[in-house]
Amino acid sequence: KLLETRSLEQTGQWPEALAMSEKLHGSVAKSISSRPVRPGAGGVQVDLRPLLVAWEIGPFTELQAALKKQDSNRTKTALISLRQQCVTCHTVLGKTDIQLPEIQ
């Protein structure tokens, strides 16, 4: 959904990109709420809820604002930041096999 958001934004489909970003949020939030505490890479239990909150109030909020303003540069920057937080969370969980494509 991350790349779909970018693709829609790049083709000027701003309302659709905003809707896709909301689907992305829904998927992430659902995944975390279904199992908020998981084993981390080092064997320690990791509570993902604070990571979700940071994701929501940081790059996701910035993405929403950029899409609403139809600002391509700001949208790309927000998507890159959003992706980086996803990668960080996956790394904390030892899920380095889950690959997230680069944002172009």
Where do the model's predicted regions map?
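Sequence context surrounding c-type heme c attachment/ligation sites in exported
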Residues: 1-104
